[in-house]
From Swiss-Prot:
Pathway membership: Amine and polyamine degradation; ethanolamine degradation
Entry keywords, A to Z: Bacterial microcompartment
Domain comment (free text): One side of the hexamer is concave and lined by hydrophobic residues, the other side has a slightly protruding, 6-stranded beta-barrel.
One Pfam entry name: BMC
Domain of life assignment: Bacteria
Gene giving rise to this polypeptide: eutS
Homology family: Belongs to the EutS/PduU family.
Gene source species: Salmonella typhi
A Gene Ontology cellular-component term: bacterial microcompartment
Full protein name: Bacterial microcompartment shell protein EutS
Protein function: A component of the bacterial microcompartment (BMC) shell dedicated to ethanolamine degradation. Its unusual hexameric shape may help form the BMC shell. Targets at least 2 proteins (EutC and EutE) to the interior of the BMC. Proteins such as EutS containing circularly permuted BMC domains may play a key role in conferring heterogeneity and flexibility in this BMC.
Length: 111
């Protein structure tokens, strides 16, 4: 039986590879992610990974949000708060990375 393997590689560069807002997550999902009282959750992945620290700073300064998870090695960032606050933080963080650090940006998505 042949199994398909997927290998994810990071290439040198500065980019936001994922920026997704989950509005009104289900209770089970929010609990599994580790943010049980979240009205909204934002998931971002960035390269290089250390950018997650800068993105977390930008997000917290942009709106009343909290950091649920930040990994400077993989570039993963999860923020949470109210829908309006998380959406504003996501918009400001992504645009700030593009404007200040000349990052390549991805499309912002929402569910």
């Amino acid at each position: 039986m042949n199994k398909e393997r997927i290998i994810q590689e990071f290439v040198p560069g500065k980019q936001v590879t994922l920026a997704h807002l989950i509005a009104h997550p289900g209770e089970e999902l929010a609990k599994k992610i580790g943010v049980p009282d979240a009205g909204a959750i934002d998931i971002m992945t960035l390269t290089p990974g250390e950018t997650a620290m800068i993105a977390g700073d930008l997000a917290m300064k942009a709106a009343d949000v909290h950091i649920g998870f930040l990994d400077r090695f993989s570039g993963a960032l999860v923020i949470y708060g109210t829908v309006g606050a998380v959406e504003e933080a996501l918009l400001q963080t992504v645009s700030g990375l593009g404007r200040l650090l000349n990052f390549t940006l991805c499309e912002l998505t929402k569910s």
